[in-house]
């Protein structure tokens, strides 16, 4: 039978949009701003690291990171993120969302600064310390995924919940753009202050010693906005759903939300008891869980996994793709800072024209169109544009067609973000019960990061030319065939989306069945 709903949860579901909603979006969103900045800014500086630490000036081309080093630098933070999502997701259900929320931010800020301070001047020492700190940076970032999503979903009303969670996630777009802008400004400033010839003109002089400061400043700068929100993150009360349904203190939940909503909220003891008993009857991966949510967990993990293979491949290696099609000039025709400047400019344009608009289209339409159809549409359009890039790939390599390639490439980002990149983050925060919500979101997100790791490590090798691979790499399938693989991955994601339930307009308890009291619970209530 359906149990009566706790009054505090009804009030939250029916609440009009208020100041505390926007505060929650900003506080949680700044974490994602830093997450995206830190995860994606490394792609901007890897070519610079190759020039600084692996250049042999007797060779005709500037140095690049060896394959194993490039994979480690690019992917180590993703490995840390996967571990952090599982650990902090579980911890968020055991200790509370707020209890561990501040720790993740501290870890991100400290490790981000430490990454920029990686010590030594030899390649081994710099890369080793950089990878060490970026792993723990990723560990902190991983915690922000389940905690931010769960906190925002549990604070929001059911009418605007999708838009509010999407708005938190949309800060990722600003983080990517901010990273590109910081790199653009820093490289432009150093390029102006320390002019240098191209590598072809003078290999030794093209590597200005001051360029070593640029990548360090870029890695550290993203901590500032997130650090400013630490105080407010600690001031947020625990979510009412955790306090009432997990910590079993409905009175405290009502008191906390009375202050937030500026209204008196009281709870009936019999309703509280029915909710608590119903929530205690089964655990993660139990038969009852698998019956109610097993297919849901399969849907959220598989779609996020498939999405991140494509999304992170595109994001982390767009600099290589732009070089291959000729949008960025050959490395030897530029000095180290000029190359960083051009890569940053390209990423800023893609973020501004494709990435950010996609996020905010999701914010605008998710509570109108629904999660399911946005995800289906996004995967479908990503498949179409990947094929549009891959089928006539030789056409796009001609200088006259570079602009068309960039436009189509930007559109794949637009429909990733106005599509599965946003919805795979939102849905797991809505469809699982309160006691397991953070854990299940962490599992879903970790599955996504497993896909990202495949994208980060696999695409680097797979996209190598079939006849003329980069130094240190074996022959790959080429960018054209790699685009076909990504198109197939997106198509599989569209098929797996058929398992995703629609949560538009429903309360969290209606989706998770937290307010359903089964026969065992009824007997326990009767005996109490």
From Swiss-Prot:
Induction and repression of expression? Regulated by the transcription factor PHR2. Up-regulated in roots by phosphate starvation. Down-regulated in roots by high phosphate or colonization by the mycorrhizal fungus G.intraradices.
Which keywords does UniProt give here?
Answer: Membrane, Phosphate transport, Symport, Transmembrane, Transmembrane helix, Transport
A cellular component term from Gene Ontology for this protein is: membrane
GO molecular function terms attached to this record: phosphate transmembrane transporter activity; symporter activity
Task: Note the Gene3D superfamilies from the entry.
Answer: MFS general substrate transporter like domains
Q: Show which residues sit on the Cytoplasmic side of the membrane.
A: 1-24, 93-99, 147-163, 233-296, 370-371, 427-442, 503-528
GO BP annotations of the record are: phosphate ion transport
Q: How does it sit in the membrane?
A: Multi-pass membrane protein
Q: Does the keyword Transmembrane apply?
A: yes
Membrane spanning stretches: 25-45, 72-92, 100-120, 126-146, 164-184, 213-232, 297-317, 349-369, 372-392, 406-426, 443-463, 482-502
> Which residues are on the Extracellular side of the membrane?
46-71, 121-125, 185-212, 318-348, 393-405, 464-481
Q: In which tissues is it expressed?
A: Expressed in the root stele and leaf phloem and xylem.
Look up the domain of life of the source: Eukaryota
InterPro entries linked:
MFS_dom (IPR020846), MFS_sugar_transport-like (IPR005828), MFS_trans_sf (IPR036259), Phos_permease (IPR004738)
Principal subcellular localisation of the protein = membrane
Per UniProt, subcellular location reads as: Membrane
Tell me where the signal peptide lies.
Answer: none
| CDD domains in alphabetical order | MFS_PhT
Summary of the function given for this chain in its UniProt record: Low-affinity transporter for inorganic phosphate (Pi). Involved in internal Pi transport from root to shoot. Responsible for most of the PHR2-mediated accumulation of excess shoot Pi under abundant Pi conditions, but not for PHO2-mediated accumulation of excess shoot Pi. Acts as a H(+):phosphate symporter.
User: What other comment is given for this protein?
Assistant: Although related to the sugar transporter family, it does not transport sugars.
What family, per the record?
Answer: Belongs to the major facilitator superfamily. Phosphate:H(+) symporter (TC 2.A.1.9) family.
Q: What is this protein called?
A: Inorganic phosphate transporter 1-2
What does UniProt list as this organism's lineage?
Answer: Eukaryota, Viridiplantae, Streptophyta, Embryophyta, Tracheophyta
């Amino acid at each position: 039978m359906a149990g009566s709903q706790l009054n505090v949860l009804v009030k939250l579901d029916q609440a009009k949009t208020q100041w505390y909603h926007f505060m929650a979006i900003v506080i949680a969103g700044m974490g994602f701003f830093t997450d995206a900045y830190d995860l994606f800014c490394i792609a901007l500086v890897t070519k610079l690291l190759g020039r600084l630490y692996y250049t042999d000036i007797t060779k005709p081309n500037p140095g690049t990171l060896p394959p194993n080093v490039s994979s480690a630098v690019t992917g180590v933070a993703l490995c840390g993120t996967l571990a952090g999502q599982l650990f902090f997701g579980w911890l968020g259900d055991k200790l509370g969302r707020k209890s561990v929320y501040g720790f993740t931010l501290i870890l991100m800020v400290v490790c981000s600064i430490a990454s920029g301070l990686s010590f030594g001047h030899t390649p081994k020492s710099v890369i080793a310390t950089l990878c060490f700190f970026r792993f723990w940076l990723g560990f902190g970032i991983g915690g922000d995924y389940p905690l931010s999503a769960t906190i925002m979903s549990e604070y929001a009303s059911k009418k605007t919940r999708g838009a509010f969670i999407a708005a938190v996630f949309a800060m990722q777009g600003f983080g990517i753009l901010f990273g590109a802008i910081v790199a653009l400004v820093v490289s432009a400033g150093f390029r102006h202050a320390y002019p240098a010839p191209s590598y072809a003109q003078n290999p030794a002089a093209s590597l200005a010693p001051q360029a070593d400061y640029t990548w360090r400043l870029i890695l550290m700068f993203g901590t500032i906005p997130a650090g400013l929100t630490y105080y407010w993150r600690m001031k947020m009360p625990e979510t009412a759903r955790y306090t009432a349904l997990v910590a079993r203190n409905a009175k405290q939940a009502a008191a906390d939300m009375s202050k937030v909503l500026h209204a008196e909220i009281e709870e009936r003891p019999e309703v509280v008891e029915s909710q608590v008993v119903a929530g205690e009857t089964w655990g993660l991966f139990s038969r009852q869980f698998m019956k109610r949510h097993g297919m849901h967990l399969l849907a959220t993990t598989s779609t996020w996994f498939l999405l991140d293979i494509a999304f992170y491949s595109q994001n982390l290696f767009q600099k290589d793709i732009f070089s291959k099609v000729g949008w960025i000039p050959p490395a030897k025709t530029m000095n180290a800072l000029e190359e960083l400047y051009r890569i940053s400019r390209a990423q800023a344009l893609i973020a501004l024209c494709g990435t950010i608009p996609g996020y905010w289209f999701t914010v605008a339409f998710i509570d109108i169109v629904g999660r399911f159809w946005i995800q289906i549409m996004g995967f479908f359009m990503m498949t179409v544009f990947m094929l549009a890039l891959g089928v006539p790939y030789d056409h796009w390599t001609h200088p006259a067609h570079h602009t068309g390639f960039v436009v189509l490439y930007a559109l794949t980002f637009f429909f990733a973000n106005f599509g599965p990149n946003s919805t795979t983050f939102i849905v797991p925060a809505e469809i699982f019960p309160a006691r397991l919500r953070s854990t299940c979101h962490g599992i879903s997100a970790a599955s996504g990061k497993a896909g990202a790791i495949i994208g980060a490590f696999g695409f680097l090798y797979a996209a190598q030319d079939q006849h003329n691979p980069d130094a240190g790499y074996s022959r790959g399938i080429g960018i054209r065939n790699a685009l076909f693989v990504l198109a197939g991955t997106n198509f599989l994601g569209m098929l797996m989306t058929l398992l995703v339930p629609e949560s538009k307009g429903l309360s969290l308890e209606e989706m998770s069945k937290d307010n359903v009291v089964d026969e065992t619970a009824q007997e326990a209530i009767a005996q109490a």
